[in-house]
Amino acid sequence: MLSRTRAAAPNSRIFTRSLLRLYSQAPLRVPITLPNGFTYEQPTGLFINGEFVASKQKKTFDVINPSNEEKITTVYKAMEDDVDEAVAAAKKAFETKWSIVEPEVRAKALFNLADLVEKHQETLAAIESMDNGKSLFCARGDVALVSKYLRSCGGWADKIYGNVIDTGKNHFTYSIKEPLGVCGQIIPWNFPLLMWSWKIGPALATGNTVVLKPAETTPLSALFASQLCQEAGIPAGVVNILPGSGRVVGERLSAHPDVKKIAFTGSTATGRHIMKVAADTVKKVTLELGGKSPNIVFADADLDKAVKNIAFGIFYNSGEVCCAGSRIYIQDTVYEEVLQKLKDYTESLKVGDPFDEEVFQGAQTSDKQLHKILDYVDVAKSEGARLVTGGARHGSKGYFVKPTVFADVKEDMRIVKEEVFGPIVTVSKFSTVDEVIAMANDSQYGLAAGIHTNDINKAVDVSKRVKAGTVWINTYNNFHQNVPFGGFGQSGIGREMGEAALSNYTQTKSVRIAIDKPIR
């Protein structure tokens, strides 16, 4: 009996340790009470093959509310073996389900998903505000565009056409558009849900399957929305969501031989690295990268309207916008007038709690981003830029920065050349059209530009000459689901939204049929 007891003791300890691991394992869903008082259930597991699961290595990370610096919840962290499992599920779903269903089935699922986003729009907007720090004003705008874009993608699903090609009477020749397969998608933290829709929408419409990595700082909305995919009728394995680091999940997706395409939105430096890694397996790559966009104000513009557009162009979403109009060029004859108007308008903007309905600018997304922005303030001052307003942290808790204007800058200053990704704008003066075009184009980036003038001939001329993928005239940060968006130069490759986005997710096959008896 004694020997039996001794022999059983190790097994008892193993059993006890197993129980401890089981009960200490982080949950796959948690109830969260939003700052507006509403409670919802937040998925916290990896979403693989239609289920929320713990990561194989049981690693987790905390998600922080940028507005109060407090922990929201803990989320499972994917590693390489989780990526492999998700890719295998996506590959199987592609081969056996999604690529072979009738296009109208994919269309209906995307329409359903758009409807579900609308149904849960207030919850999704609140999740974005809590997780990202953006104001509800911004978050609601994001969610509205998400549903519109998913519906647009649904409309394209049964309109992916090939061509019949005249190659003479001895052959019948045609081309068809086919999906690629498993698509790896890596989205940023500034527009989590919007970028989720920009990535999965065209991929699903064209018959591909997806393994998507949200940013570590903002994974919650993508996880919540993944369960809406199930409800919409999208089969298991078609959409997989893997919270985790870029160095692990992003790297593995970019290198994985069964991933046929990578779509990335983020920094130019990371985009370059992804291209290098993806080149080993010759993947199709689309990149939406950084920007340092010019916003030009001519003397004949409606100056009050121009000032509002300038502010919206740089301070919207706390300045965390890839196409933010961060370089302002004002014609010399109205320079001081516009600068004063901009100062007054900037100081009227309310900064603070994202759930305050009167707040325009919420928090920066992370402590890291907050200090990066404040470091650029110090750099600008040291280089001799004139601080007009802002230039400091707002409050003592939360990652808030006062909207900041620097004037009288020189074109070789770092604050003019480098992407800050925050609520900081530089202001310069110009005299002639040729002068401002030269300054506007003196950048490695080419994502967007703004032009403010009441002279339509001048507007068209300048829009042709400025090197940017999107040009806004007498408006800024004005998006539509059917208008392609993407950059020139080191701002990226490929286009998001509109018909142009679909080509990123298809490949062309040509078919020639020999005709024994010539067709007459």
From Swiss-Prot:
Coiled coil stretches, renumbered: none
A Pfam family assignment: Aldedh
CDD domains recorded: ALDH_F1-2_Ald2-like
Active site: E288, C322
Domain of life from the UniProt record: Eukaryota
Metabolic or biological pathway: Alcohol metabolism; ethanol degradation; acetate from ethanol: step 2/2
Activity control summary: The activity increases in the presence of K(+) ions: 15-fold with NADP and 40-fold with NAD, respectively.
Residue span of the annotated presequence: 1-23
Keyword tags: Mitochondrion, NAD, NADP, Oxidoreductase, Transit peptide
Any single GO CC term annotated in Swiss-Prot or TrEMBL for this entry: mitochondrial matrix
Compartments, record wording: Mitochondrion matrix
Summary of the function given for this chain in its UniProt record: Minor mitochondrial aldehyde dehydrogenase isoform. Plays a role in regulation or biosynthesis of electron transport chain components. Involved in the biosynthesis of acetate during anaerobic growth on glucose.
Family, similarity comment: Belongs to the aldehyde dehydrogenase family.
Protein name listed in UniProt: Aldehyde dehydrogenase 5, mitochondrial
